[in-house]
Structures are given as structure tokens and as C-alpha cells.
């Protein structure tokens, strides 16, 4: 498995995933994002990477600096046949390890409260729940959604690579 920087040539695949309600439902977009390739390219100039396995794009991950030494991350394993195989845990281990090696001291993320599969993965990597946000935002269907905030310090990181 490899994680590589996002290139404009990958926008078609990323757009397809982001417009797929089955892929995006966990993030509050059950009908997808309704975005174009051009919008994807414009919105994602920094911090977006794609996950490949056996020369096949299977997902994406991203990070951005939110404060001095703090990176916020996200991940999606978009191909359903690649889910529940430890691919996300391995990809996160690669990304988090790289972030810690490059000077970040804390990693933060959030996930939907109902996404217990992701919560299990995050906690297995050493993430600690910081806060639960009940009915804190509305999805595209107008339904209130809840989320969980997590953080990880380097000393607590459990790598799976």
C-alpha cells in the first residue's frame, strides 16, 4: 500500500467518490457532495493524498495544520471491498507516523457519532475521545448529526506498520 500526493489527474476518481452517497453518508452527505472535477481541484491544493493498493486507488486521506504542532486529519476507504481488512488502520499508521516525524506533536480528528467502526480504529491507534458534540450540525437532508472529537499524542501512538 502507498499514500501519494493528490494530482489533478486523480480528480475524476475523487469526484466520483465524493458524489457517491454510499461513500459519503458517514460524513453526513447521504446523497454525495454534488461537486465537479474542477471544484475538487480548486478545493484540494494542499494536504490531500490518495491511498493505493496493488496499483488501484482505494481511498483518500488528508491533513491540515490547525495550530502550532497540531494536525487535523481525515480518511476514507472508498472502495467497499477494501473496508474491514485493516487497510484504514495501516494507512492511518503511515500518515500519522509521517506527521509525527515531520514535527507535529498532536493529531486531531472528528467522526460521526454513529460511525463506531471508525471510532474502534481510532482508539486502537491510541486516540483519546476528547468531546462528544450532540446534534451539533445538520446534514444535507436537514437531519441533526452528532460527532466525536479525538486527539492523539505521539507518546500514545500505536502503529500498525
Task: Describe the role of every protein-language-model region.
Residues 1-16:
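A short beta-loop-alpha structural element at the N-terminal edge
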Residues 27-82, 92, 98, 153-157, ...:
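Acetyl-CoA-dependent GNAT
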Residues 46, 145-149:
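Short hydrophobic/aromatic beta-strand or adjacent loop that forms the aromatic wall/cage
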Residues 79-85, 113-114:
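Active-site acidic-Proline motif in GNAT/NAT acetyltransferases
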Residues 84-101, 119-124:
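Conserved acetyl-CoA-binding loop-helix of GNAT-fold acetyltransferases
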Residues 88, 92, 114-118, 135-141:
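Short glycine/proline-centered loop/turn elements that form peptide/ligand docking sites
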Residues 103, 110-112:
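N-terminal beta-strand motif that seeds the catalytic metal site of vicinal oxygen chelate
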Residues 108-110, 128-145:
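Conserved catalytic-core motifs of GNAT/GCN5-like acyltransferases
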Amino acid at each position: 500500500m502507498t499514500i501519494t500526493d493528490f494530482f489533478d489527474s486523480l480528480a475524476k476518481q475523487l469526484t466520483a467518490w465524493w458524489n457517491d452517497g454510499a461513500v459519503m453518508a458517514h460524513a453526513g452527505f447521504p446523497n454525495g457532495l454534488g461537486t465537479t472535477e474542477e471544484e475538487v481541484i480548486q478545493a484540494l491544493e494542499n494536504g490531500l493524498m490518495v491511498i493505493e493498493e496493488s496499483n488501484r486507488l482505494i481511498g483518500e486521506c488528508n491533513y491540515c495544520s490547525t495550530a502550532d504542532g497540531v494536525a487535523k486529519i481525515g480518511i476514507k476507504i472508498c472502495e467497499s471491498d477494501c473496508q474491514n481488512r485493516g487497510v484504514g488502520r495501516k494507512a492511518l499508521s503511515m500518515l500519522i507516523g509521517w506527521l509525527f516525524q515531520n514535527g507535529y506533536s498532536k493529531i486531531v480528528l472528528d467522526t460521526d457519532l454513529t460511525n463506531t467502526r471508525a471510532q474502534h480504529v481510532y482508539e486502537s491507534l491510541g486516540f483519546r475521545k476528547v468531546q462528544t458534540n450532540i446534534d451539533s450540525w445538520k446534514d444535507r437532508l436537514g437531519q441533526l448529526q452528532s460527532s466525536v472529537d479525538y486527539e492523539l499524542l505521539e507518546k500514545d501512538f500505536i502503529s500498525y506498520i
